[in-house]
């Protein structure tokens, strides 16, 4: 798949079947870092095998952490509490879930580190996190444009027990500080409080972070979404083993197939017991008119097939809490019974690409009437006669490729450019897709 320049999708009419989800990217990289900083050995099962987890695994090994591949999505991590390597140059691709948390953790290590990534990573802002870490006493220098990677992290003088961070650009900045805080609290014996400035976006991702920290014995005292305190002497202790649940953001594409293609499509790996906020996308689908059923670790979706004249209900919704899954809603809007609007999606602009611009561009190619602003996008679906054949650019963004696979339910010919970009989170996506759909 990685070698293909493009993939022509056949026109599809139906989708049904069962699909096991790959491991959650958000959980996988958080667990890998926590396990590396914990006392004891952790066996991790269900780990996502993708570009983003590979760069995290490579970075941890460079930092001296012993990681053993046990096969079949299982690894063993020997916790080091502090990274043995005091000097390293790390290449972290376009993995925000690796770059941001490692920046915070390394800032507290007292070593000499350089962090870089692909060109797009060097366009993704990190200034709010760096400002917070500098105020904490860290020494961090920009190696290019101020406010953006690459970074040089040196030996700082961590003294403050209260840190403030902006919450309006990316919740990963708060996650990074939370994951790193036990390093300092455990070393100093003093509690560390992290204050959030402004409105915190993507709150469900913070819930994932707090849940995983608790599994490793660090319970965070909260003052709503404004302040988070890690007690003095806090330290991560391995639970011995931990299972990574399926990726709820990835589930959105497969569930959407079930809705648009009649279904049912059932995904396994997430369900009523999931800790991921993107499972709420099932409620979004229900509001569109889909039939949704759930179990402890599965979700099933069906609907009225659009190839038979079915249409989803038009929507005007705030997607602040589920920005990744919201991309699926944007392409589903091609099959709505009226104009649709996605609000509060400003975080799209600093993701793997400027997703508002990319979505606007590619949806318009198919014949939709699209408008967008700083944090919103609206779409009027094309009439059947207005659909246009399109070569869909994926903008080196895995989610663009997966979202636009849904366009094959329409009457136009769809070509996905650079389909291999799905390797960031779901290398086998188009194989799984082919197993669910039919003409």
Curated annotation (Swiss-Prot):
EC annotation from Swiss-Prot or TrEMBL: 2.5.1.19
GO biological process annotation, one example: aromatic amino acid family biosynthetic process
Disulfide feature: none
Domain of life: Bacteria
Residues engaged in binding 3-phosphoshikimate: 25-26, 30, 170-172, 202, 324, 351
Main location: cytoplasm
InterPro entries: Enolpyruvate_Tfrase_dom, Enolpyruvate_Tfrase_sf, EPSP_synthase, EPSP_synthase_CS, RNA3'P_cycl/enolpyr_Trfase_a/b
Cellular-component GO terms for this entry: cytoplasm
Location relative to the cell: Cytoplasm
Catalytic residues (UniProt): 324 (proton acceptor)
Pfam families membership: EPSP_synthase
CDD domains documented for this protein: EPSP_synthase
Keyword annotations: Amino-acid biosynthesis, Aromatic amino acid biosynthesis, Cytoplasm, Transferase
Gene3D superfamilies for this protein: Enolpyruvate transferase domain (3.65.10.10)
Catalysed reactions, semicolon-separated: 3-phosphoshikimate + phosphoenolpyruvate = 5-O-(1-carboxyvinyl)-3-phosphoshikimate + phosphate
Binding site for phosphoenolpyruvate: 25, 96, 124, 172, 355, 399, 424
Keyword Ribosomal protein: no
A GO MF label: 3-phosphoshikimate 1-carboxyvinyltransferase activity
Family recorded in the similarity comment: Belongs to the EPSP synthase family.
Function noted in UniProt: Catalyzes the transfer of the enolpyruvyl moiety of phosphoenolpyruvate (PEP) to the 5-hydroxyl of shikimate-3-phosphate (S3P) to produce enolpyruvyl shikimate-3-phosphate and inorganic phosphate.
Quaternary structure annotation from Swiss-Prot or TrEMBL: Monomer.
Protein name: 3-phosphoshikimate 1-carboxyvinyltransferase
Organism: Bordetella avium (strain 197N)
Gene from which this protein is expressed: aroA
């Amino acid at each position: 798949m990685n070698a293909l320049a493009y993939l022509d999708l056949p026109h599809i009419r139906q989708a049904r079947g069962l699909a096991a989800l790959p491991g959650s990217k958000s959980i996988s990289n958080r667990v890998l870092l926590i396990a590396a900083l914990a006392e004891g050995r952790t066996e991790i099962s269900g780990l996502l095998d993708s570009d983003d987890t590979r760069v995290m695994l490579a970075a941890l090994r460079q930092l001296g952490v012993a990681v053993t591949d046990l096969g079949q999505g299982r690894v063993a991590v020997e916790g080091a509490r502090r990274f043995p390597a005091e000097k390293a140059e790390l290449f972290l691709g376009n993995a925000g879930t690796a770059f941001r948390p490692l920046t915070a953790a390394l800032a507290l290590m007292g070593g000499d580190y350089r962090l870089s990534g692909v060109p797009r990573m060097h366009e993704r802002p990190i200034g709010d996190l760096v400002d917070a870490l500098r105020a904490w006493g860290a020494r961090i220098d920009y190696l290019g444009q101020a406010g953006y990677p690459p970074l040089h992290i040196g030996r700082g003088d961590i003294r403050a027990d209260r840190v403030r961070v902006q919450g309006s650009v990316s919740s990963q900045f708060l996650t990074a500080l939370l994951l790193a805080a036990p390093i300092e609290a455990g070393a100093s014996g003093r509690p560390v409080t992290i204050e959030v400035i402004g409105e915190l976006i993507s709150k469900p991702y913070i819930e994932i972070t707090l849940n995983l920290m608790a599994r490793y014995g660090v319970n965070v005292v909260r003052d709503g979404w404004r302040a988070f305190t890690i007690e003095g002497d806090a330290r991560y202790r391995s639970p011995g083993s931990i299972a990574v649940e399926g990726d709820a953001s990835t589930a959105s594409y497969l569930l959407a197939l079930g809705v648009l293609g009649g279904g049912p499509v059932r995904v396994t790996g997430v369900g009523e017991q999931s800790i991921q906020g993107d499972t709420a996308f099932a409620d979004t689908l229900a509001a569109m008119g889909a039939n949704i059923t759930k179990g402890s670790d599965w979700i099933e979706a069906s609907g009225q097939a659009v190839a038979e004249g079915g249409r989803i209900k038009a929507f005007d919704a705030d997607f602040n809490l589920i920005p990744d899954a919201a991309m699926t809603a944007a392409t589903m809007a091609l099959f709505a019974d009226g104009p649709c609007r996605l609000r509060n999606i400003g975080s799209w602009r600093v993701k793997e690409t400027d997703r508002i611009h990319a979505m606007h561009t590619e949806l318009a190619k198919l014949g939709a009437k699209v408008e967008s602003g700083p944090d919103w996008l609206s779409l009027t679906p094309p009439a059947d006669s207005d659909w246009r054949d399109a070569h869909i650019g994926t903008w080196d963004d895995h989610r663009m490729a997966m979202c636009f696979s849904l366009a094959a339910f329409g009457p136009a010919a769809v070509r996905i450019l650079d389909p291999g970009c799905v390797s960031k989170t779901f290398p086998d996506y188009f194989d799984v897709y082919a197993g669910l759909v039919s003409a």
